[in-house]
Amino acid sequence: MDVSVVRPLQAHCVLPAGAHLAEGPHWWAERSQLLWVDIEASRIGLFDPRSGHNSFIDVGCHVGCVVPTASGDLLAATADGFLRVEPTSGKRSLLHHPEAHCFDNRFNDGKCDPWGRLWAGTMHYEFVPGAAALWRLDTNLQSRLMRSGVTISNGLAWSADRRWLYFIDSPTLQVLRFALDQQGDPIDAGTVCVEIPAAWNCVPDGMTIDAEGMLWIALHDGSAVTRWDPASGEQLASVEMPCSKVTSCCFGGADLDQLFITTARHQLAPDQLEQQPLAGGLFVAEVGVAGLPAHTFAG
């Protein structure tokens, strides 16, 4: 991938977790902790950047994303559906499973919108094109289908003024932007605002947005997190990573000015793992801009 057109930034590893597929970072501001998931190990991570300590909650099934709730527990989107998880005991309860009939699908990336609802998308274990969907779990605990015909549902972000939703279906190499009404529902079919060049031989994965409205996109197989202007489609910056499978990112820290980055080691050959010993770890980059506060589930 050629990112020579932008000033490269650097990241450093803060937790050499060795996760097969670390994903879904979420800054839990009330606890000053980073929530993240180790999808294939079926567990939720809670990382304290101040002490460097990390603990896990076993979920019992592949978990794609996790967010805190207004009541202080956790909401996870998993292969078994939407689960409420008590962070101390690990006790789990099923809320709803909108794809219970799709045995080969699991939930992947997800986030809460500014209205306190969880958006989470699915993917087929064999990456069957169009076999997945994007769902929204409303605060009444009912699921609503937001987009069908998805292949690998991934990054989500909302603009600070609540006018725009950004969404990634990874194999398309595109970020779609949807106009929203005052209730946060899409009012158009979406337009392409960012496109990852096919020549880079990577796909867009997780995504976050900063206080200036710019998108930060993790490049799976691209060894980088890249910053883009959704208005012009222009790439503005790049965080160089020491591992190829960069999965997602979010802003955290007391001032939301640290970019936390997740990575993976799955699908890497032994010689690649030798060259990428920190693959599967959590990283932090100082990128010179702050992010927006993450939202909790209001239900």
Which residue stretches match the model-derived regions?
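A short beta-strand motif characteristic of beta-propeller blades
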Residues: Q10-P16, G52-D58, S93-A100, Q142-S148, ...
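Beta-rich, blade/repeat-based domains predominating
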Residues: A17-R31, G60-L75, H101-R117, M146-W164, ...
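Conserved beta-strand positions in repeat-built beta-propeller and related beta-rich domains
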Residues: W28-A29, L34-E40, L75-D80, L118-V128, ...
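A short loop-to-beta-strand structural motif that recurs across blades of beta-propeller domains
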Residues: R43-G45, G81-L83, A132-W135, Q174-L176, ...
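Hydrophobic alpha-helical segments and helix pairs
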Residues: K91-M146
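Loop/turn-rich, solvent-exposed surfaces of beta-rich toroidal or solenoidal domains
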Residues: Q174, F178, E195-E234
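Short loop/turn segments immediately following beta-strands, especially the blade-tip
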Residues: F178-P186, V287-L292
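Blade-level signature of beta-propeller repeat domains, shared across WD40, Kelch, NHL, RCC1
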Residues: C250-G299
